[in-house]
Amino acid sequence: MKILGCFKIVPDLDFIAQEDWMADGQLQVDTSYAKLLWNCFDEGALEMMLRLSDLSEGFDVVYELNALTVGRLRHETFLKTLYALGFSHAVRVEAEEDVDLRFCPGLIADVTAKYVKETASSDVIVMGTQSSDGSNMKTPLLLAERLGWTCITQVTAMEPVDEKHLKVTSQEDGKTAVQVVTVPIVLAVGNAPCAYLRVPTLKDKMKLGKRPIEHISLHEELAESQSRNVELKGLTPI
């Protein structure tokens, strides 16, 4: 079973000085100097994938873990960490420094869906339910819509069943739901108990962390997305 983990790298906003919380001409705050972190929900999702793989031995199921992120060159260190943890393939969709993708869930969903349909098919896509900066909570749902797959949100655990099924635990209206689901499926991870990603050993970093990372251009999808956008021409008082 092929599982694709989609994640986002975000700045540590605790490092932003109070006097730096000033928007520029494009209504953006400069966070370029802040420390980079895994998005907290995505970090839990990636660890959940590893734990699922750990449990697979007793179920005679083989899980191929892959990872995809939309980000800059400096984000590749995180992909190398996933290689060291045992992920099979890592992909970075190249985002330009001057392109703000925080509030573009449709574009992110389009890029991911195109990759799954045309380049590398997957049985399960796992990602955090939201990010700490954009926080739109739309990307998993839009991705499932693009693919025509089922989507379960607020996932807290995954367990192996067989090559075509997973046992998924999620939160629904304050209650816990446990269900056996059929792949393909999109799983959006919420407040999972496994909130932190394990740390690879130095040996694994040296042995596995230097594998090549696949790169995908964002230009075509970005142009299509911008052509569909509505342009604000002006505001008139009522």
Predicted regions and their residues:
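N-terminal beta-strand-loop-alpha-helix module at the start
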Residues: 1-66
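Glycine/charged-rich beta-loop-alpha catalytic/anionic-binding loops adjacent to active sites
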Residues: 24-35, 88-96, 121-127
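Short internal beta-strands
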Residues: 64-72, 92
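Gly/Ser/Thr-rich loops at beta-strand to alpha-helix junctions
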Residues: 71-74, 130-135
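A glycine-rich helix N-cap at a beta->alpha junction
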Residues: 77-111
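Glycine-rich phosphate-binding loop signature in dinucleotide/nucleotide-binding domains
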Residues: 112-122
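Short Gly/Thr/Asp-enriched flexible loops that form oxyanion-binding sites at enzyme active sites
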Residues: 134-149
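Electrostatically charged, flexible surface regions
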Residues: 155-238
